Amino acid sequence: MKVSLFATCLVDTLTPSVGMATGRLLQRLGQDVVVPPTQACCGQMHVNTGYRREALGIVANHVRAFAGSEAIVAPSGSCVASIHHQQAAVARRAGDEALAQAAEELAGRTYELSQFLVDVLGVTDVGAYYPHRVTYHPTCHSLRLLEVGDRPLQLLRAVRGLELVELPGAEQCCGFGGTFAVKNADTSTAMLTDKMANVLSTHAEVCTAGDASCLMHIGGGLSRLRAGTRTVHLAEILASTEDAVTPDQRTTPAVRA
C-alpha cells in the first residue's frame, strides 16, 4: 500500500526521530512510504485559539498536499483528530462546500498510527524488541475524539522484552492542551504534577504515548524532577528491534510528490 506520512509540525520541528521511526516501521511492514513535500500544519492550533478564518488556507493546503494519497498516517492522535473533526467544519463555515467535501473524503483515509496498524494492516505484533518497563498514557484526543481504545496497548503487549505496567488515572489529561498550558499555567502545572505522580508510582523506565506534544510536557516535568523516567513515543518503541539503530544508519522515507 502507498502510505503518505503526515509528519505534523511538532514532530517535524522538535522530534524528527518520531517521524523517521514511523517511516521505518511502516516500511518494515511492507508499505510504500512517501512524504508529500508540500505538507504543513493541519490548522488545529489556529482553530483552537479562535483563528478559524486564518485556518482556511491551511486546510486547503493540507487537502492539496495529500490529494490522491491511498492512506495518510500520522504519529499523532491530536492532529488526526483535528483532520477528522475540524477541517471540514472550517471550510463549511467559510462557505466553501467543495473544500469541505474534499476534507471529509481525505479524513476518511487518514489514520493515527495505531489505528492504521491494527485496523487497516491487521497487525498487532510488528516485530519490535524493547527490553524496558513501560507505562502508557492515552492522550486526550486519541482517547476521546478518535477513540483508539486499547489499540496501542495491543501493540505494546506484543513487543518482545517489554514489561507493560498499567498507569493509574490513565484517562486524566496531562495538562498540556497546546496553548492551554500557556494561558492556564497554574492549572496545567497542577494537572502535570498529578500525572507525573501516577507515572512515577509505576516505577516504569519509560512513559510512552501517541502524541509528541504530551510527551514533551510530561518529559519536561520528569526531567526537572530528575526522576530517571524518560518519555519515548509509541512509534519509536514499535520501530525498535534487536539491531541497534544509530543516527547514521537511519533512513528517511523517500520524498515524492
Protein language model annotation of sequence segments:
Residues M1-A257:
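Iron-sulfur cluster-binding electron-transfer modules in prokaryotic oxidoreductases
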